[in-house]
Amino acid sequence: MKHIVKNILTNKERKKLIKDCEPYLLSGKELSKKYGIDITFPAKQTQEQIYNIPCFTDPINKILLASANTLRQSLVLKRVWINCTSGKKEDVLWHNHIPMEWSCVYYMKTLPFVDSGTLFKDGFMRAPQNSLIIFPANLDHCPPTSPFRFKRYSMALDLVRTS
């Protein structure tokens, strides 16, 4: 089951998050080099341990709280990173987050009616800017393409239930 939670951060917090992430965004080639693997990641992304960076702590905690309250489960954060896509086809890579239990996408900055949401195999799930989609991690998904070269910022989180 997929869930949408709206109004996660204040507008000031959301804009600060966008500004704060800029120096941490890496190209796919830079990210591959950092991880020491021969895969080119799509678009620009941060590394997946940004929870260790103080400027991201509060927004991540708000998203975790919203996720735990929505799912009515105690959750542990396993990975979190930020994506910056521009609607290009090369930014699209169908994927899932197995073996995680839950995945979330928080929409930091989107273009309404164009790229505000996530494409799943069963269709596009629309979600407004400053909202969160929570879904089972085994679902294949990708960011939508767009004819506009507008920067779309999203934060991805992988979660598991506490034992």
Q: What is the predicted function of each stretch?
A:
Residues M1-Q73, D91:
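Non-heme Fe(II)/2-oxoglutarate
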Residues Q73-T145, F150-S163:
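Catalytic core of non-heme Fe(II) oxygenases with the double-stranded beta-helix
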